[in-house]
Regions:
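Conserved N-terminal phosphate-binding loop of PLP-dependent enzymes in the Aspartate aminotransferase
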Residues: 1-328
Length: 328
């Protein structure tokens, strides 16, 4: 078998014909329970009837139009996101990496717009994950991700997160005069599936207020209902300035977005950022459908209920096999 795809993925020798709900069906007619879900993407499973209907209906009307014009479907989704969250404004993208890059631009442009042109550094957690684009991998601070992609993209500093010392003891010393923002994943992904404790998130907010810098909470992977709340940071009552999202908001369709409060968004005037495909009518029709379902209390309560069930029973299995399973 000759593949003409680049070798940047170590693909398993299995392919699928179709999916239904939580199941995938292979080209060899095997049924699989899909625990991967496209890596935190298929928030409503495979081929959800309402998503199929939304794509079908919108595809008959309009797929793409330039952002030089108003897009009602995008206006609707932006309003829903703002009504549900801390945000005052939304910029649509196509992926998580795009959303992260845009979040960095928003933070830097804000300070530039108020006359602080040298205030542009972003403080991140070492070995986090913010995407695969050039700035994003250097924001992540992982040698594994950045090796071979030099020269180093400047503008990023790093702190270490340890569960034993969740309050970032060296945080204050890492914030310089030219620091513009702190950017962290609310739940570390590549860093080991480690939630940032609520007290720690509140501490970050306090420090950002004190130092007059912005707080960016990356919810690309942990947001859109995965934690049982619409955003994972909601339980902490913290209000960030900027939040990049993607993955689950599209339910399998490429959608990303940056949510911003009025202050953070003030520098983003016409011409400062753009996306050819971001916010297109077809994507927005899908996003509105996902939003209508995932934002409901009943849906989120079911996530919490399912989470308790899995934690209880997975811990039972862990206790049975302590040498095999280290942590749940």
């Amino acid at each position: 078998y000759m593949s003409y795809l680049a070798k940047n993925y170590n693909r398993k020798k299995i392919s699928f014909k179709y999916g239904r709900g939580s199941y995938l069906y292979s080209t060899k007619n095997k049924k699989y329970l899909d625990f991967v879900q496209g890596i935190a993407v298929n928030s409503l499973g495979h081929a959800h009837p309402k998503l199929v209907k939304a794509i079908k209906n919108q595809s008959k009307k309009l797929w793409h139009v330039s952002n030089a014009f108003q897009i009602p479907e995008g206006e609707k989704l932006a309003k829903s996101l703002c009504d549900k969250t801390f945000a005052d404004y939304v910029m649509f993208q196509n992926s998580g990496a795009e959303a992260t890059e845009a979040a960095i631009k928003v933070a830097r442009k804000y300070f530039y717009s108020i006359g602080k042109k040298n205030k542009n550094r972003i403080l991140c957690i070492k070995n986090s994950f913010h995407g695969r684009t050039l700035a994003a991998i250097f924001a992540s601070g992982s040698k594994k991700m950045t090796e071979g992609f030099g020269p180093k993209v400047p503008g990023f500093d790093h702190i270490v997160f340890k569960e034993s010392k969740p309050r970032f003891p060296k945080l204050r010393s890492k914030i310089k005069k030219n620091t513009a923002a702190i950017m962290v994943e609310t739940i570390l992904g590549e860093g080991g599936i480690k939630p940032i404790p609520d007290k720690c998130l509140n501490y970050l907010r306090k420090i950002c207020n004190e130092k007059k810098i912005l707080l960016i909470l990356d919810e690309v992977q942990c947001g859109i209902g995965r934690s049982g709340d619409f955003f994972a940071f909601e339980k902490s009552k913290v209000k960030p300035d900027i939040v990049p999202i993607a993955k689950g908001i599209g339910g399998g369709f490429p959608i990303g977005a940056v949510l911003m409060n009025k202050k953070a968004a003030s520098g983003m005037i016409a011409g400062t950022h753009g996306s050819t495909f971001g916010g297109n009518p077809l994507a927005m029709a899908v996003g509105n459908t996902v939003m209508n379902i995932v934002s409901r209390k009943k849906f989120l309560n079911n996530v919490k209920k399912s989470s308790k069930y899995f934690l209880l029973n997975l811990n039972k299995i862990k206790n049975q096999y302590p040498k095999i399973i280290k942590e749940i």
